[in-house]
């Protein structure tokens, strides 16, 4: 098998625009969570040049964010799971992005994983939502690491973002909407929420996930804004707003609904 082609256990899928991504057939795969995180991050900092994606997994959030930035923008990623960073490395190569993306195999909780003095205009993260011991552990290690808090929680993501966020920069993350830690973690780490979007997966239900855009408190951030996106309407079909979001992102529309 050539490195640019998927094995029997992998797929090579469209992510955004003409960029593609390698994924395991039965592993962790990119989702709406990743796309909305990239969407709000790029909207918050459209002229960002130095991007960091923490806990980057297979690279979906970082790639989708970078795609929406100017060609001069560059991306650094941090990922602990070897299988995920290996897939991301191949995605970088197949998209011709080797000169724009630097992949780091390590733990985002370790300040030494990046060079001293590293600072970024745009930071993204998709923390796992489930505390260890509170849910059923996936038998697939890659999935387990993406869903369970095996290497820290949203508090660790916010602490790391605070460490590497440049003055005037923005940290955007996606998290469970109903979890009180979603709001508490930024505040506990000197970050102010400047925007929150909630995502209702089925009309009439509570929001399932939320994206928060944050800034350093000492940067005198602007007043907080909010928004809501409903994914499926009362009839179970994709809403016009959701399909418009997919078009704006340059991401293929869902196949069903």
Feature map (PLM): residue ranges:
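Conserved class I S-adenosyl-L-methionine
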Residues: 48-55
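Conserved SAM-binding loop of SAM-dependent methyltransferases across substrates and taxa
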Residues: 58-72
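Conserved SAM-binding loop
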Residues: 88-89
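A short acidic, Gly/Pro-enriched loop at the edge of an enzyme's catalytic core
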Residues: 113-123
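Mobile active-site "lid"/loop adjacent to the S-adenosyl-L-methionine
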Residues: 127-156
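SAM/dcSAM-binding transferase cores
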Residues: 206-257
